[in-house]
Amino acid sequence: MPKIERAIIMAAGLGNRMHPVTLSTPKPMVKVNGVRMIDTVIDGLHENEIYEIYVVVGYLKEQFVTLEKEYSGVRLIENPYYDTCNNISSLYVAREHIENAIILDGDQIIYNPEILAPEFERSGYNSVWTDGETDEWLQTVENGIVTACSRIGGKGGWQLYSISRWTAEDGKKLKRHLEIEFEQKKNQQIYWDDVAMFCYPKEYQLGIRPMNRYDIIEVDNLSELIALDASYKKYVEEK
């Protein structure tokens, strides 16, 4: 059975939907009830004995330097394209580390570290079964294999979350496909997730990792941040 050896944390984005909080603090470093979001991610990885951790940085990158001092094994990778390209650029600059890796966003809160367990059977995303309507990416799964994915959501499917695992074989493949899309095709405004899911779907047999909805919270905007931590209400009241 494959086992995760390293992690890649995406932390280069601008966090525009969380202005004005993110005007001075990169989104993964924003504190929710006193704890930085990225700390819940790194601590969760450590609980699963994953210590080789690459953090891809861009916007306000200097604020992440403290992580290398606070956590042994954390290394920063700079994404010089963060403000001109979509997040395909972040995985592109970290492409040497995808084999046997778990890839996850730094701007989410991990409530259940078990969802980051290192053992896995096939490459794929942590997912939550959704009966009701959602506008998030929704996967169709047959016999444990993802057979389709809708970018516009739907209902009655597996909602994809930004935690994924990649075998050594699929990691090599994904590295090659990233280079083709980013370097040769200049396809630089897509999500990195598009590469396996939509650009080369026939070359991967992705599975899913079922989890519960409240094992993790993705904080997308200021109103969601306020719902979790009332101390941020002041930003709305100041407007």
State the predicted function of each range.
Residues 65, 69-137, 169:
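Conserved beta-loop-beta/alpha segment of the NTase-like Rossmann-fold superfamily
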Residues 1-23:
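N-terminal nucleotide-binding beta1-loop-alpha1 segment
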Residues 2-7, 160-239:
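Conserved alpha/beta core of the MobA/IspD/sugar-nucleotide pyrophosphorylase nucleotidyltransferase superfamily
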Residues 29, 139-141, 208:
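A structural signal for short hydrophobic beta-strand segments in well-ordered beta-sheet cores
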Residues 1-9, 35-100, 184-187:
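Conserved N-terminal catalytic core of the sugar/cofactor nucleotidyltransferase
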Residues 28, 73-75, 205-207:
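Conserved beta-strand segments of alpha/beta enzyme cores
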Residues 24-38:
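Short catalytic helix/loop segments, enriched in acidic residues and glycine
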Residues 112-186:
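Conserved core of the sugar-phosphate nucleotidyltransferase
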